[in-house]
């Protein structure tokens, strides 16, 4: 029986524990959780860069959107290298693949090569987003999941444990949704995950689970935590 293969999306904010830059203790704890479950599950990871730069936010403040997005992509490379280091300290075997060529620190992203790494038990970390501006890392996570034939996309969120009817940090009456279709999520304008990412999943029948960082190991292991999204 083939191993379960998952694509895990980690937000940049999770690397700083909600603060800017990288908190070594936080990343070490994340890495330890991943290594524990990587013995029996093939894990690929897309990392965000929001703890350094957010392209959309920089653009709103007057910077050219494409340049701002490239800055965000470079932030994801920093996070990928930090995660790689702590994964290896915890005993994991890893590879970083970047969508932008930087051969001194990462392989160039090649889907077939990534699949080979996964079958050999390596944790593969995808960096630099899509290598092009105007794509969120949520959307890139779905693209990568489709390309490496992952069974599910797991979206780990910092500060929220699933999809809600409204922003729970603003509206205390917001209700958690445990299961929802992509079409309903799009029609209701639920914004926890990028709409382009939801549309891609809906088009290709790829399941998704959105959950809080505290449930990372359970989500990767296949337990029903957070919110399940499907067709």
Curated annotation (Swiss-Prot):
Which EC class does it fall in?
transferase
Q: Name one Pfam family in it.
A: AA_kinase
Question: What is the recorded name of this protein?
Answer: Uridylate kinase
The similarity comment for this entry is: Belongs to the UMP kinase family.
Activity regulation note = Inhibited by UTP.
Q: Which gene encodes it?
A: pyrH
Keyword hit for Transcription regulation: no
Q: Which residues bind UMP?
A: 49, 69, 130-137
> Does Transcription show up as a keyword for this record?
no
Q: Name one GO biological process term.
A: 'de novo' CTP biosynthetic process
* Binding-site residues, ATP: 9-12, 50, 54, 158, 164, 167
GO molecular function (one): ATP binding
Sorted alphabetically, which keywords does the UniProt record give? ATP-binding, Cytoplasm, Kinase, Nucleotide-binding, Pyrimidine biosynthesis, Transferase
Give the record's GO CC terms. Answer: cytoplasm
* Catalytic activity annotation: UMP + ATP = UDP + ADP
Q: Which CDD domains match?
A: AAK_UMPK-PyrH-Ec
This enzyme's EC code(s): 2.7.4.22
Where in or outside the cell it occurs: the entry states: Cytoplasm
Q: How does it assemble?
A: Homohexamer.
Pathway participation: Pyrimidine metabolism; CTP biosynthesis via de novo pathway; UDP from UMP (UMPK route): step 1/1
- Per the UniProt record, the source organism is Tropheryma whipplei (strain Twist) (Whipple's bacillus)
| Predominant cellular place of this UniProt entry's protein | cytoplasm
State the protein's purpose. Answer: Catalyzes the reversible phosphorylation of UMP to UDP.
Q: Which residues form a coiled coil?
A: none
Q: Which domain of life is it from?
A: Bacteria
InterPro entries (UniProt xref): AceGlu_kinase-like_sf, Asp/Glu/Uridylate_kinase, Uridylate_kinase, Uridylate_kinase_bac
């Amino acid at each position: 029986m083939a191993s379960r293969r998952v694509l895990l999306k980690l937000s940049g904010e999770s690397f700083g524990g909600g603060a800017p830059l990288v908190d070594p203790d936080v990343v070490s704890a994340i890495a330890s959780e991943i290594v524990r479950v990587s013995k029996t599950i093939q894990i690929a990871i897309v990392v965000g860069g929001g703890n350094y730069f957010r392209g959309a936010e920089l653009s709103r403040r007057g910077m050219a959107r494409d340049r701002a997005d490239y800055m965000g992509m470079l932030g994801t490379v920093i996070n990928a290298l930090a995660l790689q280091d702590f994964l290896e300290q915890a005993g994991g075997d890893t590879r970083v693949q970047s969508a932008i060529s930087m051969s001194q620190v990462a392989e160039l992203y090649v889907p077939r090569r990534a699949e080979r790494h996964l079958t050999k038990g390596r944790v593969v970390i995808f960096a630099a987003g899509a290598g092009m501006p105007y794509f969120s890392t949520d959307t890139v996570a779905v693209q990568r999941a489709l390309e490496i034939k992952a069974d599910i996309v797991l979206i780990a969120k910092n500060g929220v444990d699933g999809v809600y009817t409204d922003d729970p940090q603003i509206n205390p009456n917001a209700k958690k949704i445990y299961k929802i279709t992509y079409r309903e999520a799009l029609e209701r304008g639920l914004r926890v995950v990028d709409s382009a990412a939801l549309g891609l999943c809906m088009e290709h029948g790829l399941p998704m689970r959105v959950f809080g960082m505290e449930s990372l190991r359970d989500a990767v292991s296949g337990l029903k935590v957070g919110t399940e999204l499907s067709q």
